[in-house]
């Protein structure tokens, strides 16, 4: 009996030790250290650099990818189209999971490729979260550009310790050509870092804060909690969220999921982007007013109305970068604390050449057909 008890005790000790080792492995991931993370900033692009065009989510017609390639050539860059970029699977996906993973791995591991631009969002990146280890995401730091469903990939890169760009995708470049938004994205990739001057908003909460920028499309970002794409586990975060075409109650639900998982406790500030086409089934003045009621409990600054997301203007943001926001009564500033040539951008001066319906922007992003 004593021998059995001793055996059980030893077994319990081994299990406990193994559990501690596993927990330590999780804690040791560098991107859980918040401001101490210091995500690597990929090298800025230069003339002749190769840029991969891949489709991690919904399919994109080859004609749109080719148009984007022409835009990139006009920027002095060399576009390289992923082998499976225009595949179609199950009516919507850009190929099977295996094909999409293959293109991502090709783009990540080819050291001659210096940046990756995603062709379209939609849905599908959540299927890829556990397909590629974080070490592979961070092995050869390079810029990845996209938004909407691509928010998942931004989370993976932040966890891997690499900055990325929340910005315009191929489907929008092909449809709109070169405008102020895409020009700013080009400038950022080439080393001209924006310092945004943002107009005042009635729902702003004044204050100054610095932290690591995380987030993206809220209905993509929130379900990633607890996965290796969850970039909210550090401290001193600046949370950015945007959405399009969702009901108010779904935005409320996703935000409360973030709050109840402690994300807001780890935030130093919040940035609300575009919420175009989101429902108005409640009598709140706006989605910003609805979300402010939760945010104000944390005594952190809130910057509303930043033109990024699914609107006509989608200004580039550096995810995983240290950022400072200063929200005042007369407006706000957003500054990335990374090296590069500075340029001041007054967001009120940035307009789209042609205003497109919400339905069109949703289709281009892959949020609808």
Regions found by a protein language model. Give the residues of each.
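N-terminal glycine-rich anion-binding loop in soluble enzyme alpha/beta folds
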Residues: 29-108, 222
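N-terminal small/polar loop signature for handling phosphorylated ligands or for N-terminal nucleophile
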Residues: 84-140
């Amino acid at each position: 009996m004593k021998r059995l008890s001793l055996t059980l005790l030893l077994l319990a000790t081994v299990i406990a030790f193994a559990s501690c080792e596993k927990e330590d492995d999780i804690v040791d991931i560098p991107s859980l250290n918040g401001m101490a993370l210091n995500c690597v900033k990929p090298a800025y692009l230069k003339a002749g650099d190769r840029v991969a065009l891949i489709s991690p989510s919904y399919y994109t017609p080859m004609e749109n990818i080719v148009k984007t390639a022409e835009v990139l050539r006009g920027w002095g860059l060399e576009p390289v189209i992923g082998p499976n970029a225009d595949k179609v699977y199950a009516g919507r996906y850009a190929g099977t999971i295996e094909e999409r993973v293959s293109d991502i791995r090709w783009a990540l591991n080819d050291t001659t490729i210096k940046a990756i631009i995603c062709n379209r969002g939609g849905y599908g990146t959540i299927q890829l979260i556990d397909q590629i280890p974080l070490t592979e995401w961070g092995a050869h730091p390079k810029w990845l550009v996209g938004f909407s469903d691509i928010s998942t990939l931004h989370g993976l890169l932040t966890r891997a310790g690499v900055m990325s760009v929340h910005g315009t995708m191929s489907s929008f470049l092909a449809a709109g050509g070169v405008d102020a938004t895409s020009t700013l994205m080009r400038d950022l990739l080439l080393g001209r870092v924006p310092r945004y001057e943002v107009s005042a908003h009635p729902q702003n909460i004044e204050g100054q804060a610095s932290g690591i920028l995380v987030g993206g499309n809220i209905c993509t970002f929130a379900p990633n909690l607890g996965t290796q794409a969850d970039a909210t586990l550090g401290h001193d975060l600046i949370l950015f969220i945007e959405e399009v075409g969702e009901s108010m109650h779904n935005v409320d639900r996703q935000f409360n999921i973030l709050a109840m998982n402690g994300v807001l406790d780890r935030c130093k500030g919040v940035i609300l982007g575009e919420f175009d086409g989101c429902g108005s089934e409640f009598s709140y003045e706006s989605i910003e007013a609805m979300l402010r009621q939760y945010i104000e409990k944390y005594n952190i600054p809130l910057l509303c109305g930043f033109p990024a997301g699914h609107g006509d203007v989608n200004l580039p943001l550096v995810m995983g970068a240290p950022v400072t926001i200063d929200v005042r009564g007369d407006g706000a500033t957003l500054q990335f604390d990374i090296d590069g040539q500075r340029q001041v951008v007054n967001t009120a001066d940035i307009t789209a050449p042609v205003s497109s319906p919400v339905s069109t922007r949703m289709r281009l992003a892959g949020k609808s057909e």
